[in-house]
């Protein structure tokens, strides 16, 4: 069986996804299917041509509709800014194509509700959808999920997490698309937030759930140079940093923090989960390990222990050997393998648009709380 893939948007993430599509057959012994890179689209014609030349796509275009409606394309991979996710998803689902979409799912919470409903209808026709959440697909986080679901934590007391970057500290960094509300829909909360919030909801699914949030946001650098004319500046309308207190259904407490101006950080996604029986901790900058504390052991055995998770992916993952160290790109490869496996073998594709909607709901609640100064209850619609 051969599945044809069309990639829409050939910037950073388009290249990452293309790398993964090309790598899957090598790492999984040809499972679950053959992959054909059919079409690549970018509004920048040079970028589209680079995709055709470098990655071997059959054709390139500046019109995403040509990718969607090509008869050999079964999977539409969306790697464009948030503003255009919705229109591409609508057309792809209507055309009967499976959709793999970068996070966040939509430009807004309202649009996310609409797209999730469309995906539910499309599922009745056998169409699969998945939103990119690559941090679910590290062996360390997969092990954390297994432990959380097994009861290892016991009664949840605390969830703490952060995702910190430093790339926007320079006030002379231009007002690019990630800083423009009309394109991205928000700031760091919609840029980095979906990664950590999805991990939290996924890890604690069936264990506990958020029932209220109290959020704060801040824009530290109020204006930036315009890309087209650096001598002129314009206001920044999105947040540089965001944080939220979370109350869970059981009474457990949570705290999440996001920043693109955290001096000294690179790609710091960290979380800690503490319960009455055990605890877990993970840091993306040390992706080959999961730290665990087992309080059910005798006190003489207490202490955090480092579990080696490296590249311990389940079969049919065959290469490289599980003993070798892990990199960020490998998680994308496994995420996209799982999406193809869901299509070929009719399995659930996760995270789907309903999972992404829950993330959008959390982000919307945090923004509403930050604006009002009050706690906001969940779910938003009862």
What residue ranges belong to the model's regions?
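N-terminal Rossmann-like dinucleotide-binding module
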Residues: 1-55
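Beta-strand-loop-alpha-helix segment that lines the small-molecule cofactor/substrate pocket
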Residues: 2, 74-75, 81-136, 151
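Short, well-ordered amphipathic alpha-helices
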Residues: 16-27, 115, 145-146, 197-201
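Short acidic low-complexity segments
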Residues: 29-31, 59-72
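Glycine- and charged-residue-rich phosphate/anionic-cofactor binding loop of Rossmann-like
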Residues: 34-37, 342-359
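Predominantly a Rossmann-like dinucleotide-binding segment in NAD(P)-dependent oxidoreductases
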Residues: 125-128, 135-236, 290, 373
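Glycine-rich phosphate/pyrophosphate-binding beta-alpha loops
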Residues: 194, 257-266
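C-terminal glycine/acidic-rich active-site capping loop/insertion
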Residues: 217, 225-239, 243, 247-248, ...
